[in-house]
Every structure is written in structure tokens, then in C-alpha cells.
Amino acid sequence: MQKRVISGILALVLVLTLTLTLAQADVRVELDGIDGGSASVTVPEDDSAALLEGYLYQLNGLEAPETVVKAEGGGNTASRPATYMASMNPTLRAVYDQLVPEIQKIAAGQGSSSAFSLGIQMTFTKEELGIEGDMLVRGDDGQYHFSEETGAAIEKAVNEVMDMDMLLNQLLAHHPYELYWFDKSFSEGAIRVKYSYGTDGQQTVMVGDFVIMMAVSQDYAVTDAATQQYYLYSPDTAKTGAASAAAATAAQVVAENQGKGAYSKLVAYREYITKAVDYNFDVANTANYPYGDPWQLIYVFDGDDTTNVVCEGYSKAFKYLCDLTWTGSDPEVVCYLPTGTMDGEDHMWNIVSIGGVNYLTDITNCDSYADGTAAIGYPDQMFLCGAAGGVDEGYTVDILGQRKVLYTYDDKGTKSIYDDRELVLSATKYSPLTFDLNQLIALARYAAGITTDESAAIDVNNDGIISAADLTAMAQSLVS
């Protein structure tokens, strides 16, 4: 409710009070002050999942993967942080600078309120507001009130300075991943400003008590266990803190395997994931269950054996560990995240590129379960395996002693993101190279030009050239 009642003439200031009240499906913050401007944007339904993934990558100093940032990726997308800052008026820039650290605290699980009080004051003269009549008029109750002309003029002046559309756009452009918890499409104003004002007489208006409120997505808000209603401006620190904890755990997994060779690292990551979680059959059996659950990646690293995942969690966790391990412009191993179908059922898996060759990897189907059963590819029949077929018709994996499984790529979520070089698969299973020390020495002598003995000309990485790259590949294989 907007209250513009001023009791008395001197030092007339509205009092701002903040109360939280439960309402159907959400919580409203009621402010005994002026409801100023607001802004919202339209986003894909699963955008919050992409932003959370981006935040997990950002926490460990990495750029988000292509499946997060490419707009063609089936809706599960987000933009990379912008590098160019649009021009804002000094007051709005001050608001922006105050909000950024508060947003970062919430993202890290350290902030429990998304209603931020600002230490900002504005003063307007009657002339600046363009008011021709009296600012204060006596009402039927005998009290003085701001005139309608004055109220409209103040609202216009404040909104020109506190441009919510500009503020929201700049926050989303420069801190997209840290705003994974923010409900940017909330219909009643994802970001809103409240304020109060008063006057010292008939010539000057003082505006203050500014509060910026940012709506919290239901996935990350404090929720009443009995009613399942949630508080719109109360982040649940247990939920928002889970992202930082998961990122730290994943980094620890990588650190613990740092001294191993490439193949041994991949095996260790597979074993970690399959021990950390089981397949969530309850979720998988839910009709039309969509990709984009923001918790799938976190569940693998939360240390809780009651939180399990579907294929999305297995494959994204494996890619995350690979991306944390192999960085730079020319990584030894690259992990991709295709979506499509497995024998006609929606599925997500991995492609691992190692030594310039791509191998199908399905961690989901390499798992065993607490009840003693196991997936069709347990323990490693669908790990860096061979597959026959092609990009358009799909690839078939022959599981010895069982059956053949057909994988097909999704046009929008996979073929539009990756090219054929990344989707063409090896027909044979990856085999770790095994060499002895004499072969390593012989190849080193050949690569260095010390000898021309062709018996040492081993094309280790299968690139058609005998070079120092083969020496590197052989050395790496010796520690795998």
C-alpha cells in the first residue's frame, strides 16, 4: 500500500517498516512506504540450472562449458559475463556497487536476506520537481498530505535516477552465474525499489530509506515445511551454500588424483561418481521429467548418500571433473556432453576425446546399486568404449554377452553445439598404451634426430607423424 500521509509540517518523514508475510505460493514484502520502479526479464524455464552450472565452474576459476553458454543448446543456457560496462548515473552506479557484494554473499551461502537497505539520500526542490501548486495540502482529516501533483513528480524524479531496467540488465550482464538464485522473471517485479520521503516545509523534499528487493527462486528460498510456501526475499543458506561446498569437493577429487596419468584419472573419476551416488529410479520413472534440475551436479559432490541422480548428474559430474583437470587451449583430454536417446529413451552421456580420438562414455550405465543389481555396462563396458555407426544414424555399442545399445544425437541440444569432429566416435575401445623404458629411449633418440632407425618410429598418438608429440604421449602412458 502506498502511504503519503504526513503528520505535521516540520520534519515530516515516512517511516519504513519491513515485514515478511506468507501468501499463497510466495511471500510478499510489505513496506510501509512508496513502491517505486521494478523490472523483470523473460528467461527459459531451465535457465537457473545453466546459471548454477556456470557458477560452479566460476568458483574453480573456469569458464562455463559450451553446453551452458550456447543459445542453441535447448534452452539450458546462460550468457558469459560481459566485459563492457554501460554508462549509469552516479547514484545508480553507487547502488550497483553496493548490490554486487551482497549478491555474491547470497551465491556463496552467506546471505539470508535479499532485501538490501541502501545508504542513499536524494533531495529535490519544488522547482526541480516542476511543482506549480502547494506541495502540502490539508485533507478532510485535518492533517497535511502531499498533493497528487507532488507525489507524481517525486515518483517520476526518483524513477529517472533509480532506473530498475538498467540496473537489472547490468547485474545480469556482469554477474550472471552469481545470480543463479535470483528469480529474474518474477511477474510482480524481480527487482524492486522501495523508499520513503518527507519535507521540511513547502520547498524541499527529502527521499531516503531506499530498499532494493530481489526475488529468490523457489529452488533456493526458505520454504515452510508444512505448507510448502516459500519466502520471496529469504534465501536458504543451506541451499545456496551447497554450490560452494560441491565445487570445493570436486576440486579435492581432482587434487587427490593429480599425480596419475590421463587414463588413470578418468578411471578414478568414474569410480568416484559411481560410489558417490546411485541411480534415482523414482525421478527417472516420473513422466516427462526434464533436463535442467539445478541440483543434479551438486548431488554428486554433496557427501549425502540419500541424494541420487539420473543420467544428467552422472554425465555433468564427469565432465566437470574433466574440465577441472584438463585446461588451456590444447588440453590432453576433452570431455563433451551430448544429449539424445539410448534405445529410444531420452539420455545424456559423455564423449571423451583423448589422443585425438573420440570415445563414447556412459557413466550412468557403469554403476552398480545398493540392492546388488547393476547397470547394463557395469563396471566399464561403456567406458571409453567402441561404437559402430555415424553421426546421423546413431552409434551402436555391442555389450558382450548381453545386447546392442543404440545412441542417437539430439539435433538441437547436440548437433547444433558440436560439429562432426567432436561427434564422430571410435569403432574400437580405448586401450591405454603400454611401453617399456627401452622403447621410450629409442623414440626419444629418433625424435631428436640422433638416429634414423625406423624400428623406433612409433606413431604413438596416431597422427601420422613421428615427432616429439609421440614422445610426450608415450611418457604420459608410462604413468597412466
Residue ranges and their predicted role:
Residues 2-24:
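Sec-dependent N-terminal signal peptides of Gram-positive bacterial secreted proteins and lipoproteins
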Residues 16-33, 331:
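Sec-dependent signal peptide cleavage junction
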Residues 20-25, 431-480:
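Cellulosome-associated attachment modules in secreted, modular CAZymes
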Residues 26-217:
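Intrinsically disordered, low-complexity N-terminal segments that are enriched in acidic
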Residues 234-303:
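Secondary-structure boundary elements
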Residues 255, 271-279, 319, 323-327, ...:
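Sec-exported extracytoplasmic/periplasmic mature domains
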Residues 269, 293, 306-322:
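Active-site nucleophilic cysteine motif
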Residues 312-393:
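Hydrophobic/aromatic-rich core segments of domains that either
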